[in-house]
């Protein structure tokens, strides 16, 4: 196996002048090419000009669209029959206050009421009156579940009156009959107290009297 051994260092003194002149010529050529390839100064300004032109075009388009929309909305409002009818109806009626300089008499200051508003006000008043009358009548017609009908009390009161009349007519009756009547009255009062419902919030005075007697 053969091994070739040589010097690893190069003698720079052996470089000829021709070799030194080559890099100079190459560098000069590269510099010319760089100068030839450099963009002109006008190309940078052309970008700004195109953007300004685009902005001007956008402004013109938006202004034309806004004018078209305004003209369309105005024509649409004029063509609507509702607005025309309302404007014709409220001509001269939108003043809520009268002018004192134009008024010659006190009668001119009075606001003229239209018959439609007057009729509407009367109808509303009649409806409210009917509702109030119906509500007041319903108070008496409604049945309170906590209250007991007064039929039993009325019957007992009538019987008491009858017994009193009999006592007036029979002044000459004996003491036995009066005792019997008293017993009947006691039974009726006890029966009446039994019929009337006694709740926690309401008590009858007769029940307390009976308790005291007992």
UniProtKB/Swiss-Prot annotation:
Chain residue ranges for the region called Disordered: 1-66, 159-193
TM segment ranges: none
Motif Nuclear localization signal, residue numbers: 117-125
Biased composition (Acidic residues): 51-60, 165-176
Keywords, alphabetical: Nucleus, Stress response, Transcription, Transcription regulation
Gene Ontology cellular-component annotations: nucleus
GO biological process, one term: response to oxidative stress
Compartments, as annotated in UniProt: Nucleus
Region feature (Kinase-inducible domain (KID)): 176-207
Predominant cellular place of this UniProt entry's protein: nucleus
Protein name as annotated: Protein OXIDATIVE STRESS 3 LIKE 5
Gene that encodes it: O3L5
């Amino acid at each position: 196996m053969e091994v070739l051994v040589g010097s690893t260092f190069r003698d720079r003194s052996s470089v000829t002048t021709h070799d030194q002149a080559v890099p100079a010529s190459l560098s000069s050529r590269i510099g010319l090419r760089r100068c030839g390839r450099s963009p002109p100064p006008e190309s940078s300004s052309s970008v700004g000009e195109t953007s300004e032109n685009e902005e001007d075009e956008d402004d013109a388009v938006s202004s034309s669209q806004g004018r078209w929309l305004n003209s369309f909305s105005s024509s649409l409002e004029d063509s609507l029959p509702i607005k025309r009818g309302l404007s014709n109806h409220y001509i001269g009626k939108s003043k809520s206050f009268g002018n004192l300089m134009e008024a010659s008499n006190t009668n001119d200051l009075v606001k003229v009421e239209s018959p439609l508003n007057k009729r509407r006000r009367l109808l509303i008043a009649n409806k409210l009156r009917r509702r109030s009358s119906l509500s007041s009548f319903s108070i008496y017609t409604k049945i309170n579940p906590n209250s007991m009908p007064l039929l039993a009390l009325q019957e007992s009161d009538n019987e008491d009156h009858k017994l009193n009349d009999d006592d007036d007519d029979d002044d000459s009756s004996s003491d036995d009959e009066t005792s019997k009547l008293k017993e009947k009255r006691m039974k009726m009062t006890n029966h009446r107290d039994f019929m009337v419902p006694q709740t926690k919030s309401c008590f009858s005075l007769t029940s307390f009297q009976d308790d005291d007697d007992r």
